[in-house]
């Protein structure tokens, strides 16, 4: 095998509770995380020159060691002791710094792809152990299930939900720094005793749990986030929420036709990035 081609899916957070700040500077979280079929395309090929090379061609996405995909490949080569060359080409379809986990998904997908390409035989559990050192969301994309994520996001429990659910994603072309959002978050009520269901049999069940503690911070700086939430509801979403630290907002719809109609309406009324997607 000389190369592999893979899809790196985005995610949305149906729920994001920030429980407390930890002594190590991270936060304990409780999230419901869901993969969607908006994907980056990744090709990993063996090269005659040792080392890792990443090409992307998207403004704001580094090609070298600052790219999580580069660090993922380098980590596996170091751990496995394999002295080979890898060329990684990433076609970005997921908006950058948008709360959709695009970077983490790229890193996770490269871990799985290099493992396959080189026949390393690492289990998903081992790849998740490696991945969490690259980013807190990386293990989720290796887990490959809708998940309740706890701790810093690395403690994962499978959640049963209806599939597929159709969503409309709207991004107002704003890059939001996750670090800035957490630095400006003011923790208030404790939520440890809140019960989050592990089964969602209909779309109304999902809409009932939509909540994101980071929304108020991001909306305070970018009021357009609130505007997008309201417009999604006006075009028929049963619920709308900012994903992650933003700036992407998603709305849930009863079926594909409703989602596509809403996406067409919002795209015609704005210059935002708008797309209808379904859950995986």
Curated annotation (Swiss-Prot):
ATP binds at residues 95-105. The active site is at residues 11, 137. Keywords: ATP-binding, Isoprene biosynthesis, Kinase, Nucleotide-binding, Transferase. GO terms for molecular function: 4-(cytidine 5'-diphospho)-2-C-methyl-D-erythritol kinase activity; ATP binding. Its EC number is 2.7.1.148. Signal peptide: none annotated. It is an enzyme of class 2 (transferase). Pathway: Isoprenoid biosynthesis; isopentenyl diphosphate biosynthesis via DXP pathway; isopentenyl diphosphate from 1-deoxy-D-xylulose 5-phosphate: step 3/6. GO terms for biological process: isopentenyl diphosphate biosynthetic process, methylerythritol 4-phosphate pathway; terpenoid biosynthetic process. It catalyses: 4-CDP-2-C-methyl-D-erythritol + ATP = 4-CDP-2-C-methyl-D-erythritol 2-phosphate + ADP + H(+). Belongs to the GHMP kinase family. IspE subfamily. PANTHER family: 4-DIPHOSPHOCYTIDYL-2-C-METHYL-D-ERYTHRITOL KINASE, CHLOROPLASTIC. Catalyzes the phosphorylation of the position 2 hydroxy group of 4-diphosphocytidyl-2C-methyl-D-erythritol. This is 4-diphosphocytidyl-2-C-methyl-D-erythritol kinase. It comes from Geotalea uraniireducens (strain Rf4).
């Amino acid at each position: 095998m000389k190369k592999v081609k893979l899809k790196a899916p985005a995610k949305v957070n149906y729920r994001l509770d920030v429980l407390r700040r930890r002594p190590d500077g991270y936060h304990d979280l409780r999230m419901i995380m869901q993969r969607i079929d908006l994907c980056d395309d990744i090709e990993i090929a063996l090269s005659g020159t040792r080392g890792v090379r990443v090409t992307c061609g998207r403004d704001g996405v580094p090609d070298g060691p600052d790219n999580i995909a580069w660090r993922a490949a380098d980590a596996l080569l170091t751990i496995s002791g394999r002295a080979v060359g890898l060329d990684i080409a990433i076609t970005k379809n997921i908006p950058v710094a948008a709360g959709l986990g695009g970077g983490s998904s790229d890193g996770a997908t490269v871990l799985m792809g290099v493992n396959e390409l080189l026949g390393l035989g690492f289990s998903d559990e081992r790849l998740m152990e490696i991945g969490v050192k690259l980013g807190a969301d990386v293990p989720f994309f290796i887990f490959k299930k809708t998940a309740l994520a706890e701790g810093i996001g690395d403690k994962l429990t499978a959640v049963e939900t209806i599939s597929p659910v159709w969503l409309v994603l709207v991004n107002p072309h704003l890059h939001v720094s996750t670090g800035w959002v957490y630095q400006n978050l003011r923790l208030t009520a404790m939520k440890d005793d809140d019960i989050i269901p592990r089964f969602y049999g209909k779309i109304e069940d999902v809409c009932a749990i939509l909540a994101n503690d980071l929304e108020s911070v991001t909306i305070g700086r970018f009021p357009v986030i609130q505007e997008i939430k309201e417009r999604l509801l006006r075009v028929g979403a049963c619920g709308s929420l900012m994903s992650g630290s933003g700036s992407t907002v998603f709305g849930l719809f009863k079926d594909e036709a409703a989602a596509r109609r809403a996406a067409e309406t919002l795209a015609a009324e704005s210059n935002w990035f708008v797309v209808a997607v379904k859950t995986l």
